[in-house]
Amino acid sequence: MDEALRPPRVDVDASSGCRRVDPPRRPVLFINPNSGGGKAARAGLAKRARKRGIEAVVLAEDEDLVSAAREAAAGGADALGMAGGDGSLAAVAATAAAYELPFVCVPAGTRNHFALDLGMDRHDLIGALDAFTDGVERRIDLAEVNGRAFVNNVSLGIYGDAVRRSAYRDAKVRTVLETADEVMRQGAVLPALHLIDDLGHEHHHLAIVLVSNNPYALDYPLARGTRPALDTGHLGILLLDVPGETHRSPGRTWTALRLEMTAAEAVHAGVDGEAMDLSSPLRFVIRPRALRVLISSRHPGMSPSARRLAPPPVRPSRHAS
C-alpha cells in the first residue's frame, strides 16, 4: 500500500476527536455481496463478523437496504454497520443518525473514499470489524440533497452524466474524460444548471458542480481528492464554467451551510458515485456532527490531507533538563 495514503495510528484523546466507548451489545452489519467485485465474499466477511458476535445480514438482490436498516434499528440493534460502496454506506449512516446509533464503515466497495477520509486503512476489510468490539467513537457531519443523505459528494454536469454510463464503474477517469469531450464539443447541450449561492449571487453556464460533505483539499498532489476534516459543519462547493462562456475565472470554490440550485428539468447526478435524477430545485444542507462513527482503535487516523495540514509533532529538546 502507498505509505502516503496509509493512516497512522494516533492517540485517542481530546485532540483526535475520538473517545473510548463500551462496545455495542446488539450490532448489525449489512453486507452487499456484489460491491467491489465481491470483495466481502472473498474475505469471508459474514462468517468472520458472526464469530465476533455481530449479526451479519447479507443483502439479497434488489433488497430494500433502507427498510432493512430501519427494521434492525427499530428491533433493538444498538449499532449499524455497512460493508459496501459509499452509496450504500450513506443509506445506512442516515438510518443510524436518525436513531442516534453509532455507525461502522466496512470498506468493501471499489474506491472506499469515505473510509480513506475517516482515517481508516481502506484495504483492511477484516480489521474494520474491530470497530464493533474495540472501537473509538467520533462525531462527523452528514450532508443531504433534497432529503437524501450523502457522505462524500454530489456531482452534477459532466460528471453527473458520466456516472450514468455503463463503463464508469470499470474506468472512471476515462469515462469522465470521454463524457467531457462529448459535452464540450461545439453544439453539445449541457444541463441548464442555475445556482444561487449563500450570498444570493447567481451562477450560470456551469460544466461541473461538485457539492461535498465538508470541503476537499485541492493544494497537495498526494492528498488531493481527500478531505482534511469531516466535522467542519460546512458544505464544500466547486464550480467549473463552460470554457469561453464567462470572463471570470472558470473555477471557483467556497464553503456554505446550505445551497440551492434550479434547473428546467430533472438533473442527472452522481450521489456518492451512484447515478440518479434529482428534481429541481436541489436543496443542499449539512447536519453538523449528526453521525456517530465507530472506528477500530488500531487505526483511528487522519485522512491524507489532514496529515499534510497537521503541525509537526513537538519533540523534547535533548538539552532539556
Tell what function each PLM region has.
Residues 201, 206-247:
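Internal helical hairpin/lid segments
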Residues 37-40, 218-219, 293:
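Short N-terminal binding/cap micro-motifs at the start of the first secondary-structure element
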Residues 30, 39, 43, 48, ...:
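Catalytic core of DAGKc-family lipid kinases
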Residues 88, 209, 273:
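Conserved Motif II region of HX4D acyltransferases
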Residues 82-86:
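N-terminal glycine-rich "phosphate-gripper" loop used for MgATP/nucleotide binding
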Residues 2-17, 198, 229-232, 239-321:
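ATP/nucleoside-binding phosphotransfer catalytic cores, i.e., glycine-rich phosphate-binding loops
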Residues 1-80, 90, 300-302, 308-321:
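ATP/NTP phosphate-donor binding region
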